[in-house]
Structure formats: structure tokens, C-alpha cells
Amino acid sequence: MNAPDKLATLLSLTREPFPASRKSYLQGSRSDLRVPMREVTLTNGETVSLYDTSGPYTEPGVAIDVRRGLPSVRTPWLDERADTEVYAGRLHQALDDGAKHEDREAERIEQLRLDAAALQRPPRRARAGANVTQMHYARRGIVTPEMEYVALRENGKREWMREYLGDAPREQRLRGNPMGAQIPAIVTPEFVRDEVARGRAIIPANINHPEVEPMAIGRNFLVKINANIGNSAVTSSIEEEVEKLVWAIRWGADNVMDLSTGRNIHTTRDWILRNSPVPIGTVPIYQALEKVGGVAEDLTWAIFRDTLIEQAEQGVDYFTIHAGVRLPFIHLTADRRTGIVSRGGSIMAKWCISHHRESFIYEHFEDICDIMKAYDVSFSLGDGLRPGSAADANDEAQFAELRTLGELTQVAWKHDVQTMIEGPGHVPMHMIQANMDEQLKHCHEAPFYTLGPLTIDIAPGYDHIASAIGAAMIGWFGTAMLCYVTPKEHLGLPDREDVKQGIVAYKIAAHAADVAKGHPGARARDDALSKARFEFRWMDQFNLSLDPDTARDFHDETLPKDASKVAHFCSMCGPKFCSMKITQEVRDYAAQRGVSEAQALGAGMAEKSSQFRQAGGEIYIPLAVDKG
Amino acid sequence: MNAPDKLATLLSLTREPFPASRKSYLQGSRSDLRVPMREVTLTNGETVSLYDTSGPYTEPGVAIDVRRGLPSVRTPWLDERADTEVYAGRLHQALDDGAKHEDREAERIEQLRLDAAALQRPPRRARAGANVTQMHYARRGIVTPEMEYVALRENGKREWMREYLGDAPREQRLRGNPMGAQIPAIVTPEFVRDEVARGRAIIPANINHPEVEPMAIGRNFLVKINANIGNSAVTSSIEEEVEKLVWAIRWGADNVMDLSTGRNIHTTRDWILRNSPVPIGTVPIYQALEKVGGVAEDLTWAIFRDTLIEQAEQGVDYFTIHAGVRLPFIHLTADRRTGIVSRGGSIMAKWCISHHRESFIYEHFEDICDIMKAYDVSFSLGDGLRPGSAADANDEAQFAELRTLGELTQVAWKHDVQTMIEGPGHVPMHMIQANMDEQLKHCHEAPFYTLGPLTIDIAPGYDHIASAIGAAMIGWFGTAMLCYVTPKEHLGLPDREDVKQGIVAYKIAAHAADVAKGHPGARARDDALSKARFEFRWMDQFNLSLDPDTARDFHDETLPKDASKVAHFCSMCGPKFCSMKITQEVRDYAAQRGVSEAQALGAGMAEKSSQFRQAGGEIYIPLAVDKG
């Protein structure tokens, strides 16, 4: 079948709501401020509502046409601020899509296709002298709708959580250890404003991405995850890219980076942005390199600047900028085990060496800030010198760059430009905390955004696991967003299943961090699932899990019958004997007696004894094994 | 095809040596002391030798007949000690294999099959008054062949490791943080003896398991992993059990627990033990429960004792004994979120409640010690009250039991019985270290052996990942052995692929812990693989990884051609541009100049510049995407 049909088929799959789930909304202070949540209805009548990144795609009522894009929820908010202007925008060039000058025919076709693209529209920018960043508003004491949206979203529905956790955890042991984070009991819009004003959180939301459902990245908010997608001349189509996006946010990607290269990247980006409810990040140097035929030393500030404006006009929410790869640092990588492994970093290193000049990105950093604040593009200051192996972790090259990123953070903040800092990479467990400490020390609490880190080098094919270990730890220590790693890392291109595996592994890491930090309510979902498990509500256990489909499929491999979904046993212990059942018997007994359970246990022994004997005829039919 | 044929087919798969690998041996002080290693030959001529748990199965020359079992490497050592006697052994009963008394025909058939079993042989036990535990020898200053074997095995071939690491890591940052462990530069037989004498390590090696290749479990040795296997009346055959064992040790299981239940468990255990080069553990209460028809309250000391002797005679190397589930602790579980989730723990809880009496296992603990020391069966003191959910982690029920296990450890040591302590379970990250600290404090540095722990409850289908995070952390903190969790945990029976997934996840966790602890040489394999990666030696990268098959398959999905196995690029960056290649250019350039790389970088810039320009015609053909 042709590409559109194929896409339609894939989308029909990814648009299916999760089992027993429906979209609900938290109503904000204005009618057009509605924060989506996923409500899971349990078989005992309870409702659990969960943070939802999947956008309108999981709402059956909404008609989706990827050629028209998603509704622009933020447009009224932008209009009301009255500090932006719509303008013609930069003239699109065939080169933006990778067409070569000599390639006349391709250029003509590109142009035709682009002219026809319904998604094209004139961009906005800040009016002369205006600064339209969320940080700028925050510092002027303005609480934007984006900030209120984030506050509602971070809290979720606290009502059901209290049923499990109470207003505060019963015991100290369950309160978590925030490791220096200052997480409030309730996130208020004012708290969000203050965090953004301090630079401790960012809300990536380009004024040319009105489709975005605002979210925050910061140490005092829920830990977020990023998934990378990207086209490939040889392996995928533009339409497949949009489907990859929808697939990624279905499984919980809070942000997506479009790392496309080669042909059609400009158009690919248009389609992704117009159809994305989550912030989109890019690495502009990749496209700039395309424009100079892949010859790093031919890069110029003019070409790079033009690319930043091109992407800012399209609505990219954050740029990875490798401004810390400075000429004086490059020789520090010479005796590394694996040198420079960041593509952006190596591009700039090649440029610096070939010209024996300081990085033009570093030298033009304030010029870049001027572009960022005209569109509210956030900085993701890239770690171009991150370690590519355990042997290179925490070395001078890495930390010299980190200190520079700290200096640049203050420059960006001088312009009220939102900023986060990228981190490694490959780091053994004993060196992970030092990464967080150094980042906090030198980068003034700007959000940290790490790739993994991978705790060992010998797990190709399983690097999503080797890195989930490091990601969970650094997330607990204070990292605000975790960039996922798929099983294909170091080996090849992630396919649809690899993307899902990477995302689920990182949802585990991020949630483990939220629970350890003691984020209010984070553990409520665990309690709800464990309660369902204990009460043999199998469907509820599946439906509350990160991947209900897989949980149910695995269970059904051994016990396919629907009856077993309500049976008070599982395949591990068999029907006649179950450890959880015994505890329930103890508890029921205590309840009958109407006295404290502890007393009942003592007083009731004799009676209990005879009860058990009556059941003595049971024959224990074990079906399988369980640990200890 | 019939079972034997099926087994033969499966075995032929699992007997295939790993790619570019051959079995080699470290020769000990006596001709019959030869420690197996796996030698991987790299394409650059280097040889890397790795710890090998796979036994004779991966040596093509060795003829294997599962009906005859493996060679008894330890028999001469046992004979020389001259402190054991061969005796008739306990009379086998049909009930041992789960045949019911009323089931005459089944009983007859069982008996016939058992009489015919070539694997049956008279057991050994300590001569009257003798104590044959490794701890007993160690405390008398005797270095046994088992101890020397362990020393050679723990060191591995240090020669090749030095090529990467030098005698000591260049920099402090790479030396690891042992978190209180005292890991020597070289493990001597005397060090092993001392660790065993102190009780800080155990060598599980029943005198009736002469086929075992000795290994150590202790905080100052490499972190080990355990895989659980077990039959199931409905899902597998005895022969499949043996194949499961071979499959588990192929992927790196250091120990295997046979958690079989139901029919044929006695015979299954015989076959597993006679064919296992790794220590085998069991939970004897499971079989004892079979013998009383699954009615926990009908258990008696006589039945339990008889089962311990039955299994000790077969050669089981360690018993999980839930002696810490005491009557006074049971009520502490009543208001838990998930009560008692350990099967052994709940069996004993049911017994205590129904009789309103103290646990017969606790009361007869010293009688059990007498059995253990007559066969050198090690204790694995079970945590029957471990938490089954994050909400129950580190509660009083758990820690009350842990303190009791500490008391019992000293009782066991009074009898020179080797002992390790089992740990949880479900524990959020911020509570993991407290588990290790409490265990060290109350259990006198007896080896800790934990199940995970799982850091969150919401990942059914992915609990091998949710628990690998906790396992890696607690392994770093000092846990000696990690019991694996498979993707099927909480949902169903692990199949062949689940077992592999669980083992690889736990090899990652254990290796991450070894690297973080700074175990000498642990990081050498990472360096060798990263060097291969950096030098585009693809086959070496695959062959040094934990799962060469998967690494190669993933790579080949994108670049199947054999040519690309030596190509200086990968699918992530494409043929004309590679970040690692650039670093190599920088390094080569510096080398040519014959001056320090740092100087060369400065001095050589201008020249480098022109060189790069010559290559300017290159067109960058990107094939895919990579993170920033």
C-alpha cells in the first residue's frame, strides 16, 4: 500500500485509547485552558488519573488530519500578550531540504511540493524590542496561561492519590529523599513562575508552536523523558516520521527531538511540529552541515544563523547548541579512550581545528540569544565533549566544557532566555553523583538533561537497560529530563519496537526517581497497582502498568482464560495456595473480630487453627515456581 | 519429536561456543585443578579472557550425556580429606516425587523409573564427629583446592587486563568506590580462606555435588547472579529442566535455584545436580509441603528434617531456610499493603498461626546446623517477610526478621556452617542503602543475597529492568549475589527467552556494581570493547559484549553486508562523516609529528586546515540519526 494508507493504518493503531482509559481534562481559570489527563476506571469502581503525554490522538472524538495539523491551543494566549507580529518570514530555499544546487529537477519538485504544503503559514516573532520568553514574563511577575497549565498538569488529580497516601505519607521512610530538591506539596502557578524566573525550570514553547501542550522541565517537577526520532534517506518516509512521533508520545515521551538529516528535513520538521502536542527539539548544526555539503570546515556563522531563524520560524521549542566545544578544550580529548563521540561536538571540533580559530558559536553566543528571545526558543546547551566510554567519564575535557556551559547559562539568563544543560553519556555508577554536583555547582541550578548515563560499555543490544540504571540514579540526584537510549544504541537505527522499549525503560527510570525524591503523589500509582495485585484484580494490575498490552499478553501466555482474570490465584503459586491469600485470611479474621489486627492475631490463634484444619483436605496443585 | 530428541536439539544449540571464543584453563597447583575461562580472540590479534560459568557444555571436545552426568572433578579432593564416608543413604520413597499414597500405579511406575536411573548413587556424609564445611577447614587454617580454585577464578587472566588498565588505574576517578568492601589487588588462596573463615564469603559446594566448579559469594569478590528454574506439572518436562540449566549458565548464571514443585521433583533434582557445574540451591519447604498434600499446618519437624536429608544426599549446595518467620513477627504484616509475598514465608506464617506456636524451623535451627555441616550445605536464610510493594519496604516486619537472621547467622557460625542472608524485594531507590547498612550491621558481614530489589511497582512485563536498577545499586553497596527477575515476574512462567532476558539484565547490574566498586580488572572488558568500537572493529565489539548474537543481529538489521563489519563508519553517522574518525585524525596527526598531541594540535592547525580543504569535495551522506 502507498505511504498515506500505511500511515493511516499505523495511526489507527496508535490512536486506540489505552484499556479502560478515557481522556479527561482539568479545567483552568479560563475556558480555553484545559489540561488533559488519562482516567483509568478500575473494576472496583475507583478512578485513577494519570499524567498524559499522548495529545488529542488518544481521544476518539477528535478528527485528526496530519495534513492539517493539530488545533492551535495557544494562539489566543499569544494574541492577548500582543507582543508578537506575524511577518512574511525567511524565504524558503530548496537547499533547506537538502537539494543540491546542481540538482535542478529535484529543486523544482521540492519547490512545487513545498508551495502546495497546506501546513505552511507565516511565522510570528517578537515585536521590535520585545522579549517573548516565558522567563521574561516570569521575571516581570507575570503568570502566563502556560505556567498555570504546567501547575495543573504537575499536580494531577490529588483526590485519588490521597486515598492511598493520605495528605502526607504515614511514615518518614515513605517520604522519599529529595536530595536537595525543593518540591512543594501543591504546585501553584506562582511556584511555576518563580521556578522559571530563577532559571530552575523551563517551559519549552516556541511562539510558532501553538499546538504544544505546555510542560515544565525542572528539578522540582516530575522527571521528564525525551525520545529521539529522525528520518533517514534510506530507511523511512516523512509520513512515517509523524507516526513515530505519535507512537513515542503514546508511550510517554514528554519531549521529542527531531534529529533528521539529509533530504526533506525542513518539510519533515514542518509536519512533525504541526502534529506535535509535545515540545520539539533539534540540533541545528546538523542541517547547517547539510547546507555546506557535509564539509564541517565550510560552516559559517551566516549559514548557522540562517538555519536557526529557519527553524525558529517553524516552531522548534529548543535547540541543542554545542557552544562549549571551545578550541582550547579540544586537545584534552586526544588521549581519551574514545575521543569525541558527540556528532555536533565533533563537527565543531573539526571546524575549530581546521581554522585554528575559536568556535563561531561561542563567539556569537549573544547574537544567538537575540534570536532565541524573539521566538522563545530554549537553549539545550550541548555536551559535545561528553564521554563515550567509562574510561573517559568525568575527565577534564568533559568538566571544562561543563564549566563553560555554566558561564553561557548566565549570558543566556542576562537575555531572559530559557536554558537547560546537556549531560553524559557513559558514566560508571560511582561517578554519577559527581556529575550532578558539578552541574549544580557550575550551572546555577539550570535544568540538567542527560543521555543515560550508561553505567557499563559491554551491553550493546541492551544499552536501554545499562543506561536506565544510570538515568534513574541521576534523575533521583536532580536531573530534570532523561534522554532515552534504545536497544539499538551503538548498533543501528531504532525501529518502532526499539523506540517503545527505550521509552518504557526511561519511564521506569523517571518514575523510580520521582518515587525516590518523594514527589507528592508519585507513589500513589504504585500503591494502586500493588493493591490491585494483592486483591487479584488482574485487569486493574494490567491497566495501571506502564504497558498494559504487554502485561496482559505475558499473563495470558500461561493463563489465557478470562476466568483467571478474576481468579484469586496466579500461575506462580497455583489455585489452592497463595501467599497473598493467607495474609488476606489473617486480615479478614481480625476484621471479623472487630478488634485490632494485632490483638486478633494473638487471641484468634486457636479458632484460626480449627478453621485451617477444615480446609486441610485441599490438595496443593502447584503450577510453577516463585523465588523463596 | 520425543523428549530426548528435543533435548538433544536444544542442547546442540546451547553447546555451540560463543563467536571467536574457545575454552582455556588456568592451571592450579595440582594437575586436577584447572579453572575454565573463555578466551575471545580479537581481530587485532589480542586475546581477552572472560569469567566462564558455562561449564563443559561450551567445550566441543567434551562428550555430554545428560543420563550419565558431568565428570566429578572434586571427588579426589573429597577422598584426600578422608573425613567423609559413603553410606546407603535414606530410603527413597515414591512420595519424594509427589506420588500420592492412594496412587498405587503411579507409585509403582515411579519406583521402576527411579531404580533404573543411572544417576542414582550412594551419598557421602561426614564421618561421625567430623565437620566437612569449607568454613570449618578455613577456620582450621586449611586452604582447600576449592579455595585455590576460587582464587584463580576471581583473578582471571590479569595480563591482558593490565594492557588496558595498567597495574593501577591512571586516575583516582577510575579506581571506583568500594563502599567499605576490602578488595585485594590479587586474590590469593589464603585471602579466600580468610574470607570464608570470617564468614564474609561462602563457597557453596555440597560434598555430594562433586561436579561443581567452585565459586565464591562474598562482598570482596565479583558480584554473582542467581537464576531460578523449576518444573511445572503443566508446562515442562524433566529433560527441559536440564536444558534450562544449560541455557541459564551459558548466559552467565553463577548459581541456579531449582524451585520445582509437584510431580517428579526428586528425580528432576537428581538430573539437574548431576548435570550442573554451578551450585544448586533449593527451598526445601516446598517439597515438604508436597509431602503433606499442600496443607501447611500439617507440616512437622520430622517431615522437614527428612526432606533436608533427602536433598543434602542429592547434593544441593544451599538451602533457603525461612527461620526468621517467627510467631511474634507475623502480626506486623497485617496492615501492610501487600502482606506476606514470600511463598516460604507464608507457608510458615500459616503454620505458626494455625498452631499458635513458634516456628519449628526456628526452634530446631541447631538440629538443622547438624545436617548442614555433615554435607556442607550452606544456609541461605530466607526473608519470608520481605516487602512485596514499595509501600511495605523497610518496615518493622522486614527488619525484625533481618535482625533474627543476624542472630541465627551467629548460631550457624558456631557450627562452622556457611551462611548467606536473603534480602528484598520491592524497595524504592532512596531506601536501598538502608537495607545494605542494616544487613551489615546485624548480620556481621555474612554475604547478602537480594531479589532485585524492584524500585517501582508499575512495570509488570518490564520488572527485569525495574529491578536491575535496584540490583546494580545494592550490588555496588555490598550485596554479594543478585537473584534475577525476569520480564514475566508477577505475571507468569518465564520461558527460554525470558530467562535469557533476566540473566542479561542481571549481568549488566552485577558488572555495573563491579565497575563501581573498582574490582581490579572489571573495567578492562569495557575498555577492550570501547577500544574495538572506536577502531571500528565491529566483530570484536559484538564478541566482547554480553550477548554477541543480539549485538550482531541488531547491527545487521541496518547494515547487513559483511563489508560493513570492517567499514570505518556505522549506520548512525554514515560513511563520509564520523565523530570518532575525526578524533582519530587528530590523534594520527599528532603522532606523525612525533610531538605531544596537545602541541601538535596547536602547531598543526594551519597544516591541518589545508589537509581538510583537500577533502572538501566529500559529500556528507547521512544515513541516520544520533543524539546531539
Swiss-Prot record, chains A, B:
| MF terms in GO | 4 iron, 4 sulfur cluster binding; carbon-carbon lyase activity; zinc ion binding
Q: Which GO terms describe its biological process?
A: thiamine biosynthetic process; thiamine diphosphate biosynthetic process
Which residues does substrate bind?
N228, M257, Y286, H322, S342, R343, G344, D383, G384, L385, R386, E422, Y449
Keyword field: 4Fe-4S, Iron, Iron-sulfur, Lyase, Metal-binding, S-adenosyl-L-methionine, Thiamine biosynthesis, Zinc
Protein residues bound to [4Fe-4S] cluster: C570, C573, C578
Asked whether the keyword Ligase is assigned, the reply is: no
Q: What is its EC number?
A: 4.1.99.17
Q: In which pathway does it act?
A: Cofactor biosynthesis; thiamine diphosphate biosynthesis
Cofactor(s) named in the record: [4Fe-4S] cluster
Q: Which residues bind Zn(2+)?
A: H426, H490
Catalytic reaction list: 5-amino-1-(5-phospho-beta-D-ribosyl)imidazole + S-adenosyl-L-methionine = 4-amino-2-methyl-5-(phosphooxymethyl)pyrimidine + CO + 5'-deoxyadenosine + formate + L-methionine + 3 H(+)
* Co-factor binding details: Binds 1 [4Fe-4S] cluster per subunit. The cluster is coordinated with 3 cysteines and an exchangeable S-adenosyl-L-methionine.
Gene Ontology cellular component annotations, sorted alphabetically: cytosol
Q: How does it assemble?
A: Homodimer.
Q: What's the stated role of this polypeptide?
A: Catalyzes the synthesis of the hydroxymethylpyrimidine phosphate (HMP-P) moiety of thiamine from aminoimidazole ribotide (AIR) in a radical S-adenosyl-L-methionine (SAM)-dependent reaction.
What protein family does this chain belong to?
Belongs to the ThiC family.
Q: Per its record, how is this protein called by name?
A: Phosphomethylpyrimidine synthase
Q: Which organism is it from?
A: Methylibium petroleiphilum (strain ATCC BAA-1232 / LMG 22953 / PM1)
Lineage per the UniProt record: Bacteria, Pseudomonadati, Pseudomonadota, Betaproteobacteria, Burkholderiales
